[in-house]
Amino acid sequence: MVRVRLAPSPTGTLHIGTARTAVFNWLYARRQQGSFLLRIEDTDKERSKPEYTQNILEGLRWLGIDWDEEPLIQSEQVQQHRAAIETLLQKGLAYRCYANEAELDAMREAQKASNQAPRYDNRHRNLTPEQEAAFQSEGREAVIRFRIDDNAEIRWNDMVRGAMSWRGADLGGDMVVARRAPADQIGDPLYNLVVVVDDAAMAISHVIRGEDHIANTAKQLLLYEALDLPAPTFAHAPLILNAEGRKLSKRDGVTSINDFRTMGYTAEAIANYMTLLGWSVPEGMEERFTLPEAAAVFSFDRVNKAGARFDWDKLNWLNGQVLHALPAQQLLDDLRPLWAEQGWTLPDDSSWGLELCELLGPSLTLLKEGVEQATPFFKCPDLEDDGVRQLEADGARTAVAQLLQILEAEPWDGKDTDRAKQLLADAAKGAGVKKGVVMKSLRAALLGRLQGPDLITTWCLLARIGEDLPRLQRCLA
């Protein structure tokens, strides 16, 4: 049975790279009718925080990604991690290294001076008991290193990249698997070791992650073999790149799912776009889809090896498509809290908010634009330059005065669009101007500018809350 996992570290909010990894794992699990699991890798005691764990879980739920078992907390598995290290020590596959930081720094400087690649030189791999005792008598603490044979050939078949091969000599020397501690203890176990132990304990069948983990995969495969554990199948997805082709980072600005939410992107658009960052849709499939729709056809045959460039225009287009297709009630539910933050309340007329959303929805690219575009419907706007020019144009004041005269003589409630059109025609005839003059002047009076949504619907909505006459009257003041 397929079992995959997402293993975020709660040292920050949910990152776009982690979100894309989550999407690929979830899609593969659902496609294969397998299980998608979570493991919270909280072993960085100083930087891990419960609020980050909560943020990650909430972010995944927001994206529509659910998991099938209770999340495993890595810090709660430390006894199993230490037991695995003890096994390696007993087998002679790991050893204590007493080299201190000053000695290691000197080693690196010497390598740099001779243009050698930085690596541990395995200097304490074969210490005699007497040498170990001498270091211990100095009070030295020790890290624990896993032996890596320079002649080892590590091979695996990657679901994205095909046949992969690494030489042991390219892995930087014997690998630290536990932090420095007194010689009679095992220090805090480190990433590559604990990942192997946890993945085996969770019966993970496929490890799906970014290509920046390829070197880790080579190291971990050696650990699987050393611990007599079954190795999973690996898939290394392409990195997400910025516009210049470099790995997307915090320096590029928005990288947190929180930021995307704040900017007004929808969960559906973000999840959709995360899928497209490295995966090509099958022929005949639209690029706009839901996660369940993608899961029905997802495979790693269509995941690219090359890095995926983040394209803001593409994301904006997708988000606009999602917003344009939202039912009015759902858009209203999404916008209501944003409007409430502005101190705006909807009128008692329950259909008014829905009709406003039907009016604004087709023009939205970001959800937050629903605040800016709704502003004239909740408070009287200032006149902008183009609005002022229109109201100062020939015939404009006459047209506004004529329309006001008709409305004061024949009040209407804004519920009849045909009546609105007739009122405009009557005002144009009475003022002796073209109907376009009346319409432009009405738009300037109501919205303060000449650009905006459908005029008749706008007028009807404002008339229903008694906002049309005061705005017309101010233009004649």
Curated annotation (Swiss-Prot):
Subcellular location(s) of the protein: Cytoplasm
Biological process per Gene Ontology, one example term: glutamyl-tRNA aminoacylation
Pfam families: Anticodon_2, tRNA-synt_1c
Binding, ATP: 250
Motif 'HIGH' region: chain residues: 8-18
CDD domains tied to this protein: GluRS_core
EC number: 6.1.1.17
Recorded GO CC terms: cytosol
Highest taxon listed in the record's lineage: Bacteria
UniProt cross-references to PROSITE patterns, sorted A to Z: AA_TRNA_LIGASE_I
Protein role: Catalyzes the attachment of glutamate to tRNA(Glu) in a two-step reaction: glutamate is first activated by ATP to form Glu-AMP and then transferred to the acceptor end of tRNA(Glu).
Name recorded for this polypeptide: Glutamate--tRNA ligase
Organism of derivation: Parasynechococcus marenigrum (strain WH8102)
Gene this protein is translated from: gltX
